[in-house]
Amino acid sequence: DVYKRQGQIVLKVVEKENDKLEALILIGGELRDNQGVAFPDSNLSVSAITEKDKEHLKFGSEHDVDFVAVSFVRNASDINLVKEIIPKDVKVIAKIELKTALDNIDEILDVADGVMVARGDLGVQLPLEQVPFVQKQILDAANKRGKISITATEMLQSMKTSYRPTRAEVTDITNAILEGSDAVMLSAETSIGDNPNRVVEVMSIICKETDSRNDTSSLLSKEDSKEDSITTTLARAAVQVANEIDASSIIAFTETGRTPLLISNFRPKAEIITFSTKKKTLNQMNLLWGVDQYPIERKETFSEMLKAANDFLISEKKYNKGDKVVVVAGTPPNIEAATNLIRVHEIGDL
């Protein structure tokens, strides 16, 4: 069978001639330009990265994009091919849409910076009743490795035309967050929907309510991959200390955003405040759960960095003198080195 419009239109191939297929329409419907085609029962030899894709990647690189999301990833080689084209500081998100990608999820996570659970095409490639379990499998794998995770497709589909979501949609978003999604994504609801601002507002309300009720204490005892084992251990320790002393926040100084991602992965009770000298890193941390990020001027010593952050937080009236924070950093500063320092600091105590 051949599926169009994420399974809403179904055709059956009855004859093949050279580069043409003749198909019988089993389930018809309205078809628009540039909509995808799925062949769930076939292994296509076409490359995941076309010549046109390469042109788009070069264009995006010239215009300083922060992320690239790669569709129809099959294995690590597809991700590596993209990484050969784009600058090193652009992060790559693998869209998991194919059965082949599920089989190769570990090797994909070895090289990708994050994954997107693209449920629309997954629901065509797999029986629909398997999609919720596959979603959890992908999110668990990403969280275990400390990679960004995004859940997408039809999260508030009814709100393309409706002012209120269905109860099932609210439950779906809540479950995606409880399962460990760093981000939830809207598609048609905002691109062609009647009231995109309202959709974003509803999504935000659901996310905030879920986060306020989510008990994440068990995450501190979860098993992790051995990747970044030292940084992961320090991130876990920072969250444990912050929880035990009821710290107002965890402050992380970062060059790449890796340490804030690992801290975020443990879902601390305290706010996560990050400082970086790099604009791209600040932009990329927008995808991380619970992270607020701020620019900081380059400093030569950790003490200077801490004083700058301390003064900023007081001036912005985020904290008062005497509030406790846990500080995480790598020393010496200004290099892409592993995090090696944790310190409990009282705001104003300098």
Regions of interest found by a model, annotated:
Residues S45, I93-I96, K144, V202-V239:
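Long, charged amphipathic helices and adjacent flexible linkers at domain junctions
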Residues G7-Q8, K16-N18, L26-G28, F72-N75, ...:
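Short, ordered loop/turn segments at secondary-structure junctions
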Residues K20-L57, A69, L178:
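Catalytic P-loop NTP-binding/switch module of NTPases
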Residues K83, T190-R213, L341-H345:
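C-terminal helical cap(s) of enzyme catalytic domains, especially alpha/beta-barrels
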